[in-house]
Amino acid sequence: MQPVCSLVYSLGIASEFAGKRVGATRIYSRLFLISYLSRLLVYSSTRLLVYSSTRLLVYLSTHMIFLPEHLPVAAELRAAGFDVADYPSSGQERARRVLLLNLMPQKLVTELDIARTLAETGQAVHLTLVRLPGQTFKTTPMEHILQFYRELTPEMLAEADGLIVTGAPLENIAFEEVRYWQLLEQAMDEAAARRLPVLYICWAAQAALYHFYKIPKHPLPRKMFGVFEQKVLQPESAAMQGLAPAFPMPNSRHTEVRRKDFPADSGLQILCESEESGIGAAFSEKNNATFIVGHLEYEPFTLHNEYLRDLAKGLPIQPPLHYYIGAPEAGRPDYTWHAAAVRFYANWLDACR
């Protein structure tokens, strides 16, 4: 593996973002090509990964991601050139210990998205897959769950540096009617009591905002579907470092939270917002929790695949907005959110100390 390829890759990512205002319809064809081709060629353990919208800084890293032994997505990451180690393994004691509470039905897809994005930050991460006690699943073989997922316990939360809670396709169900709601509430309360850094994604963000602040979710007249420019409202916040003045973020949801429902005395900070898609992310200093309603972890073709899936089911769906290069039929996504995803997750990992 040649470090120069990694440098080209990193410069490609940084160039996608540095010094440009990220418009939702802007095409980054040349810069995306640099980033994409370099990513296909090689990933080195030496990466330049610190950048901002106004300057480019050099940071060399020799870290890797630690995953459960024989986890299928580990092989995919290795094939893409990522530095992946099975645990237990030497060096893992210096890695950030992150728990992934994966509530999505297609668990392997989400495992890959999260693991890939964490690996792209260049920081050493020990990722543990967890599930709520007694949870069973219909769409992922239980053999996979029993082999790779551990039941979440208070002791695990006490030892962790951070927790990621994914979304779930439960938007049309009242929170209290979700079969594992009480178990999820217990986990959220335990993490908040320890001030463990938690990243709540999409439905989980709405669920946590409802649990802690009674902020309701509101149904949308049609699916919020596409890549939407987020205006950074708190550029000085740790989560938004290097993302101002704006960045693109994929959204795929049927409900939303609204600014008017945020209690004035909650201490919640709205970090970013979109004229089209509404509130993008918020932060609670009290609970040390970040709530993001979009999916920066998505790989380039996720929205396209969701679009084809909904079409095949005969569901009312429009092509994802601000996403395709050319006509939707060509199926050419514009991966404009890649740099923002790496930066956002790097910022969050920095808080996991």
Regions found by a protein language model. Name each.
Residues 1-4, 10-11, 16, 40, ...:
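Short polybasic linear motifs
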Residues 12, 26, 33, 61-64:
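Generic short N-terminal amphipathic or hydrophobic helices
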Residues 19, 29, 34-36:
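Generic detector of N-terminal low-structure segments
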Residues 35, 145, 166-169, 328-329:
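Short glycine/proline-rich turn/loop motifs
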Residues 63-134, 149-155, 159, 186, ...:
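Amide-donor transfer/coupling interface in amidating biosynthetic enzymes
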Residues 133-146:
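N-terminal beta-loop-helix "entrance" segment that forms/cooperates
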Residues 165-234:
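Cysteine-nucleophile active-site neighborhood
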